[in-house]
Amino acid sequence: MAEAPLHFPETECQRLEPHLPPPQSPETSPPSPSTLPFVTLTFATSLDSALALGPGIRTALSGPQSKAMTHYLRTRHDAICVGVGTAIADDPGLNSRLATTAAADVAHHTDGSSKDKNSSGDAITTHQPRPIIIDPHLRWDFTAESKVMRLAREGRGLAPYIVTLRQDLPTHKRRLLASLGGKFILLDAEHATGRFDWRAILSAVRQEGLHSVMIEGGGEVINSLLGENASLVDSVIVTIAPVWLGKGGVTVSPPRTRGADRPVARLSDTTWVPLGDDVVLCGRIAR
């Protein structure tokens, strides 16, 4: 049974607008000279900077209003990206359930248009983001019944592009992806350093015609971006939930160079948006 669509007020959409990628319309937008997409880093955290109670433990932090905001953000990006750990732990759908009233007139995108109705006749968003899974060593053992695949099959989302270093791609996995419109994206072996080569990943995403990507996690992905790759991030949108998860959680704490006498990264041009019991912090990485 289809999940109920979410609603996000137009007034709140406008407060977020300065921190979002410019709308893309193939009919009116000139080709972008950039080799990288617009990157929004977004996640929900506790008051003690934790994403989850522990590795592999799915932990709900966002309230209903900020959850609806996340689905609105998905309509404003061409792609949504998570790491393999999140794909394994959460079996995410990586789609948007936003009702069209909140987003239909806001943005035009390069692909991913779809529309569905629930049992009450509510129209669901006209745009779906392309899921991007970063899985260098093909750890994610997806099947036709994985949520993102099922949603793609039902027309309520898109099949993922899986970024990997592995050359020996399983034939049945490749065929399953292709049957739903997804595929593997192979990075060159020179990037097999055991670390995230974000410039290579983002360049590969842009080469697929995707102008913007929101990166949602998990912890290793977020920390690697906020560290030495912070210059690649255009916007940061963080939902802060009024809860402490306690010691042992997966935290946002990017690596700092030994002996460095300044913070790893700092936000500028900040906006605070209260949403229910949560508060959302929007900003840009200070250059």
PLM segments and residue spans:
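Enzymes that bind and transform nitrogen-containing heteroaromatic metabolites
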Residues: 1-287
